[in-house]
């Protein structure tokens, strides 16, 4: 049967919601064809295959920018059992961009920290969440129930009139040319075909990605391959359990205990070489027996059991023309740092602003190449840390475990061990950031920019991102710095749809909320930005739309130079045809 286009009823054309700040008016007017009622889904801006957290986040980020998005998934509903259980502050900050962070945070609990327990039951390693103040504006690490999180993300998608989702549909093939991707989709209930043409397609379809397989995209194996049993249970009676998460580093049976939100608890248990993973899929008795090695099961109610083969894999190339890999389709990591879901959300954030910049003609197509450059290195570093923790936990040689305990205990006792888990999450190591003449990143470039609480005049306190939005932002602590920018520098800021803001500690109260050039003047509540800039001996920072630092300026001349370099990286290589084609 030949594939034929199927027209699906939908209505695009509602502008993205205006946000609270005067800086944050919708900055991507929908093109004429997008403003037509009952637009066919056969022609969209972005097609996303996979409706898990990565795909749903990307759909929200692109929908909020006003793009026509179609997201498909072969499942008919959300998988109703917990999978990922922890995430970090950057994830909530990304969720903040499309208005669900508060809802997600309200249903989560702070991560209590983790103790690594050695052969004799002694603590050999400890991790704590980063102490206050919360530099990104959110809890450093938090516990959640994934089905609830996915429901919140999908409800947010449903509120976007220019985004549609198709459940129980499978991507069965695609082709691409210079201008678009043509995808063949099948409705699983009756085999009805659908052809969709999209300017870009994103594979967020998981570890067994159909798209990655069709691309024949090679994957790098970082040599971690272990079978683990995962058991989620609800506390249903009196029971003594640790208040903090625990890594049981015992050769006889390595395991992990995780404190979930509410009464949810998780145990991850390494299977021994002689054990058959299939046995634990089929036998509740076997699961309960092995769980009994870690806790009293009489006061627990079973929620779900899964047997996973933990991998450490990273795709070599994440961009293939107009097709991109994201989430588990691009990388898989063992769970010992709780960063698997976080990595996929970061992929979505990195990709969203770059697709937006290219489709709006603010940058050339080469910007999209930096997606692989930036995210792959970041993920490799995180996977490396997760793998190293997994090797600590999973050591099964008694003599090696005894030596491990001796070294780690000594490091902990002497203060040589890093105990803040967030410090194992790096900044960006290369990509679109300010560089030194030798190609290294300038000091501070690639870090996540902080998010202070600010207000205008005597107004309410807001997180800074809510008042600036997903765009390039020049944040300065002195009006003199911004006033010194010449017309060329100011024109660059306007050309990239950037904004300037002035943030001062305790000085804006009672003063005008804008200067003569209409630059917003904010007062910060906790002195966070003042301290941050002082640490770099700086007067201003350029933050990217995804909140990573492009560059930090020590003076007004340096700020102007950074803007010129940013113009070179973004605007000058832009293809005029893109501007003409996309308005």
Name these PLM-found stretches.
Residues 3-45, 49, 64-65, 118-121, ...:
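Helical substrate-recognition/capping region of FAD-dependent monooxygenase/halogenase enzymes
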Residues 83, 88-156, 260:
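Active-site-adjacent segment of FAD-dependent monooxygenases/related oxidoreductases
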Residues 63-83:
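Glycine-rich FAD pyrophosphate-binding loop
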Residues 167-181:
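A conserved short coil-to-beta-strand element within the FAD-binding core of flavoproteins
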Residues 44, 190-200:
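Core beta-strand elements of the Rossmann-like FAD/NAD(P) dinucleotide-binding domain
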Residues 280-343, 378, 382-385:
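FAD/FMN-dependent oxidoreductases across multiple families
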Residues 55-56:
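N-terminal Rossmann-fold NAD(P) dinucleotide-binding loop
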Residues 106, 154-156, 200, 204-310:
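Conserved FAD-binding catalytic core of PHBH/FMO-like flavoproteins
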């Amino acid at each position: 049967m030949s594939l034929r286009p199927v027209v699906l009823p939908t209505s695009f054309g509602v502008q993205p919601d205006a946000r609270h700040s005067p800086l944050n008016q919708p900055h991507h007017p929908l093109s004429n064809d997008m403003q037509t009622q009952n637009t066919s889904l056969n022609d969209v801006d972005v097609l996303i295959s996979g409706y898990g957290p990565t795909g749903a986040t990307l759909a929200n980020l692109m929908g909020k920018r006003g793009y026509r998005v179609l997201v498909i998934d072969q499942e008919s509903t959300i998988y109703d059992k917990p999978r990922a259980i922890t995430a970090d502050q950057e994830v909530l900050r990304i969720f903040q961009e499309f208005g669900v962070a508060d809802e997600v945070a309200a249903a989560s609990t702070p991560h209590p920290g983790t103790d690594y327990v050695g052969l004799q039951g002694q603590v050999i390693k400890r991790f704590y969440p980063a102490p206050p103040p919360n530099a990104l504006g959110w809890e450093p690490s938090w516990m959640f129930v994934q089905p609830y999180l996915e429901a919140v993300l999908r409800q947010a998608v449903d509120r976007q009139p220019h985004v549609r989702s198709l459940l129980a549909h499978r991507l069965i093939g695609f082709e691409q040319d210079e201008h678009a991707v043509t995808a063949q989709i099948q409705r699983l209930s009756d085999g009805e075909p659908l052809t969709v043409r999209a300017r870009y397609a994103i594979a967020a379809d998981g570890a067994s990605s159909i798209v990655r397989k069709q691309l024949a995209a090679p994957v790098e194996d970082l040599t971690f391959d272990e079978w683990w049993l995962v058991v989620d249970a609800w506390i249903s009676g009196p029971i003594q359990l640790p208040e903090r998460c625990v890594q049981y580093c015992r050769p006889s049976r390595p395991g992990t205990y995780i404190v979930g939100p509410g009464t949810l608890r998780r145990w991850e248990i390494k299977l021994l070489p002689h054990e058959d993973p299939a046995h634990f899929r089929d036998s509740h008795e076997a699961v309960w027996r092995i769980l009994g090695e870690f806790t009293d099961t009489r006061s627990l109610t079973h929620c779900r059991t899964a047997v996973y083969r933990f991998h450490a894999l990273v795709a070599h190339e994440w961009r293939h023309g107009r097709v991109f890999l994201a989430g588990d389709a691009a990388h898989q990591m063992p769970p010992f740092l709780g960063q698997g879901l976080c990595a996929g959300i970061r992929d979505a954030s990195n990709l969203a602003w770059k697709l937006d910049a290219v489709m709006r003609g603010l940058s050339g197509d080469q910007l999209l190449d930096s997606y692989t450059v930036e995210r792959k290195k970041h993920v490799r570093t995180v996977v490396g840390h997760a793998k190293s923790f997994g090797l600590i936990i999973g050591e099964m040689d008694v003599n090696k475990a005894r030596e491990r305990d001796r070294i780690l205990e000594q490091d902990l006792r002497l203060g040589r061990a890093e105990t803040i888990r967030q410090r194992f999450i790096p900044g960006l190591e290369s990509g679109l950031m300010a560089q030194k003449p030798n190609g290294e990143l300038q000091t501070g470039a690639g870090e996540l920019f902080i998010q202070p609480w600010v207000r205008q005049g005597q107004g309410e306190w807001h997180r800074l991102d809510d008042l600036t939005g997903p765009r390039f932002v020049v944040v300065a602590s002195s009006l003199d710095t911004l006033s010194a920018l010449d017309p060329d520098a100011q024109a660059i800021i306007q050309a990239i749809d950037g904004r300037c803001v002035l943030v001062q500690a305790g000085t804006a109260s009672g003063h005008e909320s804008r200067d003569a050039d209409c630059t917003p003047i904010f007062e910060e509540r906790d002195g966070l930005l003042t301290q941050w800039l002082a640490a770099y001996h700086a007067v201003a920072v350029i933050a990217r739309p995804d909140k990573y630092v492009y560059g930090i300026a020590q003076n007004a001349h340096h700020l102007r130079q950074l803007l010129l370099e940013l113009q070179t990286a973004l605007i000058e290589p832009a293809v005029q045809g893109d501007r003409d084609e996309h308005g």
